[in-house]
Amino acid sequence: EGIVSFLNKVCEVELEPYIESSYQELADYVNAYDQKMIMKRENIADRGIWTAKKRYILNVWDSEGVRYEEAKLKIMGIEAIKTSTPAPCRTMLKDAFKILMSGTEDECIEYIEKCRTEFKSLPPEEVSFPRTASNVEKWHSSSDLYGKGCPIHIRGAILYNHWTKKKEIDHKYATIQNGEKIKFCYLKTPNWMHENVISFIQDFPTELDLDKHVDYDLQFSKAFLDPVKVILDCIGWETERKNTLESFFS
């Protein structure tokens, strides 16, 4: 609290007046009609991790003058806030980032394992990736079902439309149209469909007998582990415990 107050005072008393006077000097130098450049302090944080430009996590104690009793995460450009990430993973990722900011590597590894177990207990609908189906008809092929280079979620949509109709369950499951909000998930191979993806609108078509082939490991890796690993690599942490020669002799 004392450090945050001190930093806030430095900004108000020293930095902001200096920046303001510098902008006024610039305005006078270029003979501006009016000085419109204004800069205010944004966040005071005790920890931060940057993965790239405009991609970062901050442990914020004060945001634009609003003081917090407990630090709040500010997440910019990271997978956790993207709607293309499955909803349960967005929650898991935010909690993982809190551990990254205030916990230990062991606590992080334990949390990842807990998330892995929880993730595998969820139904396909909750672990699948949200997308929008665009150009379904464009990518559809009468000879090979889908054209070369077809995006994976559209390929899943075409396969869904084809097999729900062929299995005569299209009365229960609506056909995926252009612009439809859909979900897709990876499948383990081999399976009877000989494909590694299936899409659906809301309910997973269990009649296709593909739910047992959902690749939970790959889904977890792409939806949760890969985004976390980007952050962990920046601070030198691992996603799992590794046996080393040093630990063998300790």
What is each model feature region?
Residues 1-250:
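DNA-dependent DNA polymerase catalytic subunits
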